[in-house]
């Protein structure tokens, strides 16, 4: 191979790698930075939180919105699932999988209902299961909700829908965009990483929910 050919091949391979380099640059895992922890204190990281800050990780991702725009997203989760989430969201981004928004629930004052109504994908929030004294998997940073408005928690035979604003999406026999089903790419991806999907629960269906 001549010198010009070698140069052109090297240039081609370099240019080919740029999208992947840019993509990797949009994704990261780190300990929770001080500025982020200040946003969390008194909100998702409430007084009496039993999860040490050192056990949590701050995950930065890129995602495609419902309108097809590329946006930055941020997630706080337990360190045990941080790399899983990083890989999952990299795959979702490569597949141009639409996610409305990915913001810390602290932007909604850690109000789960407000976050769900805004169709916000989120993970850590130190709270109890509604109507129970048990800690939610979200309290441990081991659960994440994806596009929750379109994929509500349905219980009591459909009489109860959470968020209530998602009632139009409670009947899963209907066809509509962004519906999480067993055959959906996102669901398969989470399952491949060892997560359990709330859409498979027996006594209620939490279609937005993945936990480990």
What residues fall within each predicted segment?
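Catalytic cores and adjacent binding grooves of peptidoglycan-active enzymes
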Residues: 129-131, 135, 140-212
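N-terminal module-boundary/linker segments of secreted carbohydrate-active enzymes
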Residues: 23-69
